[in-house]
Regions:
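A short, N-terminal "cap"/entry segment at the start of jelly-roll beta-barrel domains
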Residues: 14-62, 150-158
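Glycine- and acidic-residue-biased ligand/ion/polar-headgroup-sensing regions
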Residues: 69-72, 78-99
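Sec-dependent signal peptide recognition
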Residues: 1-7
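Short beta-strand His + acidic residue motifs that chelate non-heme Fe in jelly-roll/DSBH
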Residues: 74-76, 94-95, 116, 121-129
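Short acidic-glycine-tyrosine-enriched beta hairpin
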Residues: 92, 98-120
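Ligand-binding loop in jelly-roll beta-barrel domains
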Residues: 109, 119-143
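Extracellular/periplasmic catalytic domains that process cell-envelope and extracellular macromolecules
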Residues: 42-45, 56-58, 78-79, 86, ...
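Conserved short histidine dyad/triad with adjacent acidic residue
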Residues: 59-79, 107-108, 117-119
Length: 158
C-alpha cells in the first residue's frame, strides 16, 4: 500500500535541495495541525491539508497530505504545476475533463498513483464514497487551484 507512496516521495526528493529527517506515524500526522485553506487544496469545507515539506505557495518542491471527508465531490479544476499523487487510504474516484462526469471516474484504491498535469487544459475532478480518503501529493510550487467553471469555486465561509 505504501510502496507507491514511498516511490513517489523518493522520486521527487531526489530533486529537492535538502530534505529534512522526518518520521511520523499515522496518529502523529492526524494529531498535528491541519489547514483547510492551504494553497493547492480544493478550498472545500471539510477538506484539510498537512504540509509535510516545503511551501506550496512558493517556488520549490513541496509535499502535502490531502484529507478528504466521505461523500465529497470536487469539481473540475487544475493547478499551475505538475503534480504526482498517491492514494494513501480510502477509495478515491478520480477523472479528467472540463466538467464532473461520474462515467469518467476511475476507482483508485490505496497504493494507486495518478498525475495532475499542470498548465494545461487537463482539468481533473474527484469524489469520495462512504469513507474518507487521504492522498499524498508532491509538486514544484508555486501551486494554485483554478476551477474550470467559476461557479464551482468554493465560497469563503461567512
Amino acid at each position: 500500500m505504501f510502496k507507491a507512496f514511498i516511490l513517489t516521495l523518493a522520486y521527487v526528493a531526489l530533486r529537492a535541495e535538502s530534505l529534512p529527517q522526518m518520521r511520523m506515524s499515522p496518529s502523529e500526522v492526524r494529531g498535528s495541525a491541519l489547514d483547510g485553506s492551504q494553497v493547492g487544496s480544493s478550498g472545500l469545507a471539510g477538506v484539510h491539508t498537512k504540509v509535510l515539506f516545503g511551501d506550496p505557495s512558493k517556488a520549490g518542491f513541496y509535499s502535502i497530505l490531502l484529507f478528504v471527508p466521505a461523500h465529497t465531490t470536487i469539481q473540475a479544476h487544475s493547478h499551475h504545476d505538475d503534480r504526482m499523487a498517491t492514494v494513501v487510504s480510502g477509495i478515491w474516484s478520480f477523472g479528467y475533463g472540463d466538467h464532473f462526469d461520474a462515467n469518467n471516474l476511475k476507482l483508485l484504491p490505496p497504493g494507486s498513483v495518478y498525475s495532475e498535469p499542470g498548465g494545461t487544459a487537463h482539468n481533473h475532478f474527484a469524489r469520495t464514497g462512504n469513507d474518507s480518503v487521504v492522498v499524498h501529493i508532491c509538486g514544484f510550487g508555486p501551486t494554485d487551484t483554478r476551477y474550470f467553471n467559476p461557479a464551482d469555486e468554493p465560497k469563503p465561509a461567512k
